[in-house]
Amino acid sequence: MSEPIYKFFTGRFLPDWYQLSKEEQDSILAKLNDALAKLGAKRIILCNTYWSTDEWLWAGVEEFPNIEAVQKYMAALHELNWDRYTEATSLLGTKWEP
């Protein structure tokens, strides 16, 4: 049985994001949330970090049921041109119980 995969991420919007209308931005974000739900994944937390760093606007954690779900979600991000609108860094991990 596969174990959950946690994705820790930080990100910021690029200039192209701000060229979109509010409706276009909301549509993309809704599609991202739909993709998470369809894969059985969830966003555990999303934090504003703009007040604590010059580099990132947000940080968060998402939980995926398995690595295949992570890969499918990344494909969904690519289909939505997410990399055109954002710059981000992420790290995958599994639960550690020492």
Language-model-derived ranges and their functions:
Residues 1-57, 65-75, 93-98:
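Short S/T/G/P-rich N-terminal loop/turn motif that feeds into the first structured element of a domain
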Residues 75-82:
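Short, surface-exposed basic-aromatic patches at helix termini and helix-loop junctions that form
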Residues 82-94:
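Conserved short beta-strand edge segments in small beta-sheet-based binding/regulatory domains
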